[in-house]
Amino acid sequence: MAREKFERNKPHVNIGTIGHVDHGKTTLTAAITNVLAKKGQAQAQDYGDIDGAPEERERGITINTAHVEYETDGRHYAHVDCPGHADYVKNMITGAAQMDGAILVCAATDGPMAQTKEHILLAKQVGVPALVVALNKCDMVDDPEIIELVEMEIRELLDSYDFPGDEIPIVQVSGLKALEGDSEWEGKVEELMKAVDASIPEPEREVDKPFLMAVEDVFSITGRGTVATGRIERGKVTVGEEVEIVGIRDTRLTTVTGVEMFRKLLDEGMAGDNVGLLLRGIQKEDIERGMVLVKKGSITPHTQFEGEVYVLKKEEGGRHTPFFAGYRPQFYIRTTDVTGQITAFTADDGSSVEMVMPGDRIKMTGELICPVAIEQGMRFAIREGGRTIGAGVVSKIIK
């Protein structure tokens, strides 16, 4: 049977369910697929299908994640749901599941709990741009005043993490009742998806952003010049265009004289393509793995940054012992290891800590020995002798 072609007739958006353990994230995810399946926009999945999420490896870290897909009238969604709290932390920090927005699930019976707060904070730190709240288990609360109080509490909480608490839609749902086929609650799930359609903005397509390609390999072709290969991360590049070579050494300007993919010559390469770019006037020794080719003037290299980091446990292949300020690991950024130093760190909530234990989540300040094209929101791994001991996301550029 021929493989089904992915139809691109609707804009694609990546979302996920976040929130406290047992507040009903997975049940709600199942309910969404069941309600939309009745309109032919999804394949119905039950709790067990989603809860038995397979393990995945992302940057050397094992994460359990369930992926479901569905459509609404206007969009195609890829939706991630994680079984355990630690999986969320790892998922959001490694960017294994990039989210354009999230559904924050909060049980009306409990109100916001510890992980509700932690997930909102994480969403803020890793740059999830928009949230919609699903106030779940509303079938179990008879008193509308209680629901009103919980809603106020959620809005204040969102405000305290710099999300627009007053504007974020809160939809009262019951994932369980909707899953059981109760039409009133099925209607609420539809209402939730309408809110998601309306308030989670469509992401800017990678191809519309300024060109960037991380260099993976370099070789010279006799009589033609130097070729840099890699996957175009964003934007597009045309033959004859000027690009900058950024990172590790001083920034240089060159012209792309050829774009090649699968041994064929192209007029342009675009986001997602694995290409070889022929560069004018550049010697093989002028460019190396770890540098990036970018649209002229779009990016500057940096050496100092702040990051949110998850440090692997011993069982995950991480360190067995703690580390202290001044620790010098390698930072694996895009395609290369750069030596650097963790000059300072605090616990995730900003309180001071003396040392970092395997399994901790920290905020850290890092300093690299040479300038590299790092950007806010970018993911990196922390390595020691070639093995990953932590994963992070750049939360702020200092210098």
Swiss-Prot record:
One of its GO terms (molecular function) is GTPase activity. Residues 81-84 are annotated as: G3. SUPFAM superfamilies: EF-Tu/eEF-1alpha/eIF2-gamma C-terminal domain (SSF50465), P-loop containing nucleoside triphosphate hydrolases (SSF52540), Translation proteins (SSF50447). Transmembrane segments: none annotated. The keyword Metal-binding applies. It is an enzyme of class 3 (hydrolase). Its EC number is 3.6.5.3. InterPro entries: EF-Tu_GTP-bd, EF-Tu_GTPase, EFTu-like_2, EFTU_2, G_TR_CS, P-loop_NTPase, Small_GTP-bd, T_Tr_GTP-bd_dom. Its main location: cytoplasm. It catalyses: GTP + H2O = GDP + phosphate + H(+). One of its GO terms (cellular component) is cytosol. GTP hydrolase that promotes the GTP-dependent binding of aminoacyl-tRNA to the A-site of ribosomes during protein biosynthesis. NCBIfam families: EF-Tu, PRK00049.1, PRK12735.1, PRK12736.1, small_GTP. This is Elongation factor Tu. It comes from Prochlorococcus marinus (strain SARG / CCMP1375 / SS120).
